Amino acid sequence: MIIAVDFDGTIVENRYPEIGEERPFATETLKMLIKDRHRLVLWTCREGELLEAAINWCRERGVEFYAANRDYPEETTDNNPHFTRKLKADLFIDDRNIGGLPDWGTIYRMVSHGKKWRHLIDEAYSGSIDYGEPSSSSHSHRSHHHKSWWPF
């Protein structure tokens, strides 16, 4: 699965243009998603030196993004005349999501288990939270036809 991840307010507390403190478990969760063979794209308003600072901050903590602010690393206006920063991702993780940003443990469960908000709410009310094996349909070989924000 291709997952676009915002930086300020999502991976770190929002202190733009400075880099805020890491949000609890953000880099650990991102590394788990990479290990699960998801392709992560850094999706941020940062450009130039500020973007490089964010990429380096993540790299120093073991998080290597597939690309930053583009669909693939080599994409430019030279080789793609229709280049746009609007990404073609399967999922977006962003603090500006409707309902706000869940904690990173919840994010991992939603991605790896294919959970939707309504499932998590039902589990919370019933007390039967599923921490089982990740869903095989959520891995990188999943069809890339369905693009969405967090499903409700």
Named regions from a protein language model:
Residues 51-152:
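C-terminal cap/substrate-recognition subdomain and adjoining C-terminal extension
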Residues 1-77:
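Alpha-helical substrate-recognition element adjacent to the catalytic core
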